[in-house]
Amino acid sequence: LVLLVGACSADIAPGTYFCGPEQLCPEGLTCDAVEDICTVPSQAGAFECEIPDRTGDDEPAAGLLLQPALDCVSGVRELKACLFVDDPGDWFQFSVPGNCTSAVQIEARLTYPVAYEPVAMQLSTDGAAPVVVDGECRVAATDTGGQTSRCVEVVVENGSQHAIGLVHSGALNCGGDCAFNRYTLSLQLSTAQ
């Protein structure tokens, strides 16, 4: 009786896996920073962002003012941008109307690829120092596709002024080699729950 024993290894086709945290890919593949997928090294591209970095929005007081203004109960405002290595952060300013008839909350969802440095969400209220506010989302995103989401729901005062910032987390950034990311911020005001 002859017993044949052989080792097998799975063949992983390029483009079948999204890049993991810190650009992690299966052996023999590398992260294509254009598509956020694992591919053969010869086809991997460098990180690109089609949205130019806005200058002067690097702190709460200088954030881009959202126009038109948000209502007491507003539709979702979606903002897409990138956080570059040399960019301290992107800030967006908005006000809560002073005439809301019920308590209002800020709802924000930040979505970004897991392959690069996680983006942190900070909130400054009425000119105070910003604080990190993001946490796990109560409702998971339906199509994650190599991305993750962080959320915030916070009750705020009528007539208050806010700046929401998307900043470097300082973690899982490949020792600085992937200290960048693309993101989508979905922001709205709603009746507090």
Q: Language-model features: where?
A:
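Secreted, cysteine-rich disulfide-bonded mini-domains of extracellular proteins
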Residues: 8-50
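Generic structural signal for beta-strand residues in well-ordered domains
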Residues: 12, 24, 31, 58-59, ...
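Generic detector of ordered, mature protein regions
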Residues: 21, 32, 38, 67-69, ...
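N-terminal regions of proteins, emphasizing targeting and processing segments when present
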Residues: 6, 55, 156-160
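Predominantly extracellular/luminal regions of secreted and cell-surface proteins
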Residues: 44-75
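Sec-dependent bacterial lipoprotein signal peptides
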Residues: 1-7
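Acidic, Ser/Thr/Pro-rich low-complexity intrinsically disordered segments
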Residues: 74-193
